[in-house]
Amino acid sequence: MRTTRVTYRPLLPGLAGLAFALGAFALGACTAVRNRPAVDLARVAWQHGAADCAGQTDPAIQVVRYDAQTWVLRQNKCLHYEAPFLFLLVGEHTALLLDTGATADSAAFPLYRTVRQLLQGWETAHGHPVELVVAHTHDHGDHRAADAQFRGRPHVRLVGLDAGQVQQFFGLRSKPLQSAGFELGGRRLEILPIPGHQAASIAVYDPTTRLLFTGDTVYPGRLYVQDWPAFRASVQRLVAFATRHHVAYVVGNHVEMSRTPGVDYPTGTTFQPNEHPLPLRMADLRRLNRAVRALGAHPARRVDDAFIIVPR
């Protein structure tokens, strides 16, 4: 299978404007093997910033096609140190974009244009349009900054940010917390409420790719906990869910750990040349569950090889 990669390139050095390159889509070939990953997320060479951001020429958005229906986008660390990952999942009639990144400016961070052109390629290959749903793994600024780029656009639904709006849109029950299905058309996702990092936090499981998207609740970095009892319950819920389903990777929204076990990059770092791979595995999720259970009702900072628990 030919790997497909889509990137922006600067029009001229030093300008924020970016041109979109669609040269290597190979849509027909990808459609024939739609469920076969084109890349291994654990081996992708992600843009990791620069020692001198003034001189770096990486695109504002790195786009990697995981398979014929799935894209992973990463924001340039020199544009914003958080460098969040965003995820675009496409079904027969609906596409889901998880998060809108850390920068609002559409000239510097042309997220809507990027997503629209990816979807146009898919629509051209399949002969019909899809509706785009824009949702968030949780309500923090580095995950919703570019919402305004999508607001009011045709064939776009922007999901609300607070826990009640999220629960209503996806049909989630709050007492007790239960997951719900979300149909994209031939691709049914499972949405799990996982409060703790933030009240509106959700996880998304995609049986097509067997990826479990966990936002800022589980990722290779500093796991900031706002509500400790809720976080403990959510981690346990994730483990129970993942045990019942085939999970290839646990995929969060940031990378803050280095490849040196237990060593993270400081907050604000714009150059991470030795960063940890994006995906975690079930073993990492189980270790996190054991750690929070061992802490019981007394939250404390704990350092693991692949993550750091940071109660607030």
Predicted regions and their residues:
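Hydrophobic/aromatic beta-strand patches that form the interior of the parallel beta-sheet core
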Residues: 71, 133-135, 159, 192, ...
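Active-site HxH/HxHxD metal-binding segment of metal-dependent hydrolases
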Residues: 104-186, 280
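Bacterial N-terminal signal peptides
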Residues: 14-28
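Metallo-beta-lactamase
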Residues: 95-97, 102-104, 190-195, 199-284
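Accessory terminal helices/loops
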Residues: 28, 32-55, 236-312
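Short, hydrophobic/aromatic-rich segments at coil-to-beta transitions
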Residues: 67-73, 179, 186-190
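N-terminal secretory signal peptides that target proteins for export/translocation
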Residues: 1-9
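Conserved beta-strand hairpin/beta-sheet module of binuclear metal-dependent hydrolase folds
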Residues: 60-121, 204-217
